[in-house]
Amino acid sequence: KRNFYGVGNGRDVTPYHQTIEDNIVAELVGELERRCAYAERRAAIRDFNRESRVIRKGIALTPVKFGISFTLTSYNQAGALVHVYTDGSVHLNHGGTEMGQGLHTKVAQVVAEEFQIDLDRVKITATTTGKVPNTSATAASSGTDLNGQAALLAARTIKERLGDFAAEHWSVPRDQVVFLPNRVRVGNQEIPFRALVWQAYMGRVSLSSTGFYKTPKIHWDRAAGRGRPFYYFAYGAACSEVAIDTLTGEYKVERVDILHDVGRSLNPAIDLGQIEGGFVQGMGWLTTEELWWDEAGRLRTHAPSTYKIPACGDRPRVFNVDLLEGARNREDAIHRSKAVGEPPLMLAISVLHAISDAVASVADYQRCPRLDAPATPERVLEAVDRLRA
């Protein structure tokens, strides 16, 4: 906690001279400590380790602060193409690639929310540069931020055209045209959304638009290592508890508690899934996924039989994941949400430190063990043996 960013007095400036304006890490960590009973469990684990000769437990709580944006500033742009058809359905194409992370669902939600129509009325087709050219990589956890904003701007352009047409067609003030779920209030009457679209088509109103978005405020001098490379930061914290076998080096992740900041979540189910998946992927990175070459320089861990990615059985026995309540991105990201792709990966550092904490108990916590990542059972056993030597 002594190393947390503070407020003012130079405690809120990064090494690359970006001021931290949305620092909530201390608040978030404090809330997780309370929820997972960190202090009480640490004391209980100390008591357990004094009585147990073979099995030792460890616990660790680690935070993460993850900057969101490409550090190559030119990548922070996106386009989208939206068509509204005369039956009231919407066709959407954007520059992001769906790879199972829920990007298409979130961007479709953004468009459906703007038009106030059901999600199943929005169809997304596969990303193609024939529709949206010069796409940026779907990376840096920025897919929803960039493509969601571009789609929102395209939809908003069409919505404004529809509103202007309705006001003129039914002779009412513009502020009396209100979009409601699947319908539009025009003065004292309500008409289905699809009926308004049909009337607009008959009135020769364009029902197609592109949208373009570029992330504001960011700049980065790579040579000098100075600037504001990130639009905002995503925060999270994880508390992990493990048990190790000091005779074999094998271990099990017994419990994980995560509290993560996603701002105003666009889709909590997707965000929770991303956090869980990112954490387990990070566990693999730090514990089992070892690259090993033989004396001839040949990679031997090149298949699922030797390169050990986490399986279902490696999942924590107890896995509690919560989104930070009341969080709201202070920057104008899409609907004040925050990115959630890569940040949770770093929360798995808590597993590595929990294993290290369990190993340290062998020497009654008097020495800090050397434990290299990935912390395979062999390396855990070596760390235990070094402390016993």
Spans of model-derived segments:
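Conserved strand-to-helix beginnings and helix N-cap segments that scaffold or border functional pockets
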Residues: H104-T105
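C-terminal catalytic domains of large/alpha subunits in multi-subunit enzymes
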Residues: K1-V64, I68, Q109-A389
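Conserved beta-alpha junction segments in alpha/beta enzyme cores
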Residues: A60-S89, H94-Q101, Y232
